[in-house]
Amino acid sequence: MTAHEVNFDGLVGLTHHYAGLSFGNEASTRHRFQVSNPLLAVKQGLLKMKALADAGFPQAVIPPHERPFIPALRQLGFSGNDEQILDKVARQAPRWLSRVSSASPMWVANAATVCPSADALDGKVHLTVANLNNKFHRSLEAPVTEALLRTIFRDESRFSLHSALPQVALLGDEGAANHNRLGGEYGLAGVQLFVYGREEGNEKRPARYPARQTREASEAVARLNQVNPQQVIFAQQNPEAIDQGVFHNDVIAVSNRQVLFCHEAAFARQERLINHLRTRVDGFMAIEVPADEVSVSDAVATYLFNSQLLSRDDGSMLLVLPQECQDHVGVWRYLNKLVAEDNPISAMQVFDLRESMANGGGPACLRLRVVLTEEEQRAVNPAVMMNDALFTALNAWAERFYRDRLTAADLADPLLLREGREALDVLTRLLDLGSVYPFQQTGAADG
């Protein structure tokens, strides 16, 4: 059956700021306390979406979350109306205000793990929401992510959506950022590669930075998504790579159809994994980048592997890269050599995503890949599909509501909270989402 990969990109939220909240993500730490530009950030993301949609790649959007998230502050013991709570937390515990104001939901590669209908025992598309429990600011995302995905994938006869795993360390799940699918045509059954950083009883784990994904979580997600057990492989990420800032597998590897593009130091027992994939995937091709051409640290700094690998109609592939790759002499030299060689990757497209990149999120972080048949794609909420009209509407929406300068101190501004809620009210109508946010369901306690 004919199927296509649809990229659902996250819209950057109004409170996009640099707070260094993500230990293990070196870009996040390095840019802490810099001044951000939320308007530029959302426009950079929209330009990438529109350019790829215009090039014939199906593209959709996933909305941002409500931030600052006042219910989390109430749960932490701050009381009063919303404005009083903002004032209290800004004076007493400003770090908590930054945590509940993170725009991290824009990195929707962490929203869920997806199983196409061709791989599922029941023939439905499955999505399991990620619990993201390694970081407090990201652990807040799952309930609203689930609500948003339910408004996008509404047809329960075609889509099965699963709530996040329990919020315990043993079941740490970071979503599609630690998941690859390999195979032939999108509509045919593929092999799903789940990548984890640690497992109970295995002493092989990173020493410096946390391994966010557990094997136990990956196995549970595969069960929830009803992936055919004959089509699943579990592999450990190289702990030494995690300690160099590879906090998700999509910072060191990307796959598309029969191609796995990765660093030679991406996986534990990598040679064995590659040989196993050769026996499981027809026409499998591993493009392993040697350390003497691109080091792990340079791969992390440029997000070479946090790229999108997209199939074109002629069977060749396009590599979508951040500007940082072109700016790095060694990485750009390697990439030009790569596209000149005999392999499916024949073209590159570079995007300026510096606002997201400074927080540690490249092109691949910003998108959730969902393989859909033509019938399944028609069952998706049509209002979220990118086209000329939506691009124009979202740019006008951003111009109306987004600030072009934001610091951590600005998060305490009650006007920012009101601006955000008004913006999301307008957006839910624009994208036909209904009352999906908590403030819309309970009413804002603004005194």
Curated annotation (Swiss-Prot):
Enzyme Commission number(s) of this protein: 3.5.3.23
Active-site residues annotated for this sequence: 174, 248, 365 (nucleophile)
Binding site for substrate: 19-28, 110, 137-138, 212, 250, 359
Gene3D superfamilies cross-referenced by the UniProt entry: Succinylarginine dihydrolase
Pathway per the UniProt entry: Amino-acid degradation; L-arginine degradation via AST pathway; L-glutamate and succinate from L-arginine: step 2/5
A biological process from GO: arginine catabolic process to glutamate
Pfam families: AstB (PF04996)
PANTHER family in the cross-refs: N-SUCCINYLARGININE DIHYDROLASE (PTHR30420:SF2)
Alphabetical list of NCBIfam families matching this protein: arg_catab_astB, PRK13281.1
Sequence similarity: Belongs to the succinylarginine dihydrolase family.
Subunit (UniProt): Homodimer.
The protein's name in its UniProt record: N-succinylarginine dihydrolase
Species of origin: Salmonella arizonae (strain ATCC BAA-731 / CDC346-86 / RSK2980)
